[in-house]
Amino acid sequence: MTEVTKNDFTEEGKIVRKIRSFVRREGRLTKGQEGAITECWSTMGIDFVEQVLDWNEVFGNNNPVVLEIGFGMGASLVEMAQKAPDVNFLGIEVHRPGVGACLAAAKEAGVTNLRVMCHDAVEVFESMIPDSSVTTLQLFFPDPWHKARHHKRRIVKAEFAEMIRPKLNAEGVFHMATDWENYAEHMIEVMNAAPGYENIATDGDYIPRPDERPLTKFEARGHRLGHGVWDIKFRRNA
């Protein structure tokens, strides 16, 4: 398992510092997480390289591809892969404990249609994701960066919407979910302004939680406390 960070440079050779949507709060791996990475990486892990993936080589078939950015500890992603064996899932997460937990859960569940990466998703999209190949891109509960001075760190922004659009297949879907109303409004504003997308909601801007997105323990607790969750789906239309 390797980790590589790309740097951009000015004409003078100075490094351009990128604004990232995440902070590496790297906790210790448990023995189980570390063991899962050691045991499962060769079959379920994908190292970052500056080369476009061939999904048939990655999964051994040409089934539809669902890609999730920031899967946390991976419980929901593994559950989705279990319930949809004829769909291929790729999860990207920057925190190694989450990657280890996801691999451990996937091994226990016996899923074979799931692969994971431990890298910055933006760099993965720029270098490795084939054009017109992703059926659904999932972004569930990303860091809201709720302080106004940190809004520039939010992953959903005009540049991101532009970058992912050519990776979605014809009528591919970008599915977002957040429990911060301000971030939901921001997502709608960004995506409404982004060319080549249409909101699939039929009543207002948001949709009910789709059956394919599992209800997390965190989300269920939020519901009990009266907290809202906003699901948003935009379809590529150009």
Swiss-Prot record:
Q: Where does S-adenosyl-L-methionine bind?
A: 68, 93, 120, 143
Q: What does the record give as EC number?
A: 2.1.1.33
Instruction: Show the active-site residues.
Output: 143
Superkingdom of the source species: Bacteria
Q: Which SUPFAM superfamilies match?
A: S-adenosyl-L-methionine-dependent methyltransferases
Signal peptide limits: none
Q: Is this entry keyworded Methyltransferase?
A: yes
Using the UniProt record, name the top-level EC class of this enzyme in a single word. transferase
Q: In which pathway does it act?
A: tRNA modification; N(7)-methylguanine-tRNA biosynthesis
| A GO term for molecular function | tRNA (guanine(46)-N7)-methyltransferase activity
Please provide, in alphabetical order, the Gene Ontology terms of the cellular component aspect for this entry. Answer: tRNA methyltransferase complex
Q: What catalytic activity does the UniProt entry give for this protein? A: guanosine(46) in tRNA + S-adenosyl-L-methionine = N(7)-methylguanosine(46) in tRNA + S-adenosyl-L-homocysteine
Q: Tell me which UniProt keywords the record has, alphabetically.
A: Methyltransferase, S-adenosyl-L-methionine, Transferase, tRNA processing
Q: Where does substrate bind?
A: 147, 179, 216-219
Q: List the disulfide bonds.
A: none
Q: Which family does it belong to?
A: Belongs to the class I-like SAM-binding methyltransferase superfamily. TrmB family.
Task: Please explain the role this protein plays, according to its UniProt record.
Answer: Catalyzes the formation of N(7)-methylguanine at position 46 (m7G46) in tRNA.
What protein am I looking at? tRNA (guanine-N(7)-)-methyltransferase
Q: Which organism is it from?
A: Aliivibrio salmonicida (strain LFI1238)
Which lineage? Bacteria, Pseudomonadati, Pseudomonadota, Gammaproteobacteria, Vibrionales
